[in-house]
């Protein structure tokens, strides 16, 4: 956190200032953000009561699975001024990430290949965006000569999609993703909380999903309980990234060759015809992760996993879950001597979690 004030944070009255000076500053901030690689910026206040009620209902239903951290911070997630006292404005920034990569559907139709969610085939976005947000906050502070700023990138209790929707960057769609009508949904979000009152962006957009339900029916594991409601416990992204233990057997075959994340509900969304290829070199595929060979990935040692995925968001799931996920994909692959040999090489792995999923995978080839 970059602080200017010492002692108690300054009091900021929760009002949007619309004087000419601050309006010019907003335009300047947009210009600076564009120079730093952001495609859009929105400004909003801290009133998120509607989203707070929705979040609590979702948590009460248990849809978060083992993600206990979703409810760990009480109302700080939906009340920015409780998380960072003095906050009265949230600056929401969008950075597009769609890489120039192998066609996703082609990869998923090739059972001996592994599918990695397109946001994760390049470098970890957290450090990239956090650094850019810090630079943006510094420029604002230098311009004003005062103020307090704190940047967040998917690593703190922040309702980032709610904030982005409220700031006019898009609408939360039936697949619970944020969609921008001119850019689709292949983008990252980052926020700057500040005690500087700034004019708010245009009111949040209406939802433009209409009668379309492509995302709901495309989900391989039927994770959508209803439009706008996701049961994370059935979501492949949750199962391959957040879930620590054994993957439910009734979901394994449905996972296909998706070894890290899932993009199906975005791939079928009509709005993503407007998504453009990112110009960020760091989001370009590394180690052929846009079209990897499952057997090759499964052969990696733990040292190779750590070395080759250094700087990748995949690394944080750890080697054990990496092997678990690939074992499931190998179980769903077309039978071949190569597949069987790879699985048998891990039959006696030190991890009971890996052994369990290898055993299941081998049973699929009998």
Task: Report the location of each language-model feature.
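Auxiliary alpha/beta "docking" domains used to position bulky ligands
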Residues: 14-208, 256
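Iron-sulfur cluster-binding cysteine motifs and their immediate structural context
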Residues: 38, 214-238, 244, 258-282, ...
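C-terminal amphipathic alpha-helical segment
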Residues: 249-283, 307, 311-315, 321, ...
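Amphipathic alpha-helical scaffolding segments comprising HEAT/armadillo-like alpha-solenoid repeats
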Residues: 306-308, 335-347, 366
